[in-house]
């Protein structure tokens, strides 16, 4: 993309409970470029919503669940965090998404450089796993 796009975080509030189709109409009225799918508590989207997002001619991004911590001490939390990122990327990719966003982790009273290196390593591992599972069309930054 070679322009700055303006998106809403989720469906505009004015759409009420009318879903993505109504949301996209409001985005058109507001002259906005798209929206971020908000997978705040889990990567879930109904078939009807998938169809509406897939048919949209708007820029789509996605926000992974908040329960991500690539600096977790517990292996099960690390695995679940990686899985949440991969699921978000896969769904975003399926729906024509441009990119995903996630909060990578917490300091847990550790040294900043250690935390940075832990998270960087896990992001590389996650990206490699995702590339093996399904080559993504998502924009990928340098790690």
Predicted regions and their residues:
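N-terminal pre-domain/capping segments
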Residues: 1-64, 68-87
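Active-site acidic/histidine proton-transfer and metal-coordination neighborhood
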Residues: 71-143
């Amino acid at each position: 993309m070679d322009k700055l796009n303006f998106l809403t975080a989720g469906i505009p509030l004015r759409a009420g409970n009318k879903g993505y189709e109504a949301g996209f109409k409001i985005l058109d009225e507001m002259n906005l470029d798209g929206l971020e799918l908000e997978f705040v508590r889990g990567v879930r989207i109904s078939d009807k919503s998938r169809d509406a997002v897939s048919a949209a001619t708007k820029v789509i991004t996605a926000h992974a669940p908040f329960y991500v911590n690539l600096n977790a001490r517990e292996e099960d939390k690390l695995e679940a965090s990686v899985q949440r990122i991969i699921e978000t990327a896969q769904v975003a990719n399926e729906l024509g998404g441009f990119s995903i966003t996630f909060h990578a982790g917490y300091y847990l009273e550790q040294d900043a450089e250690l935390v940075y290196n832990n998270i960087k390593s896990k992001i590389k591992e996650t990206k490699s796993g995702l590339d093996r599972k399904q080559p993504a069309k998502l924009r990928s930054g340098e790690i």
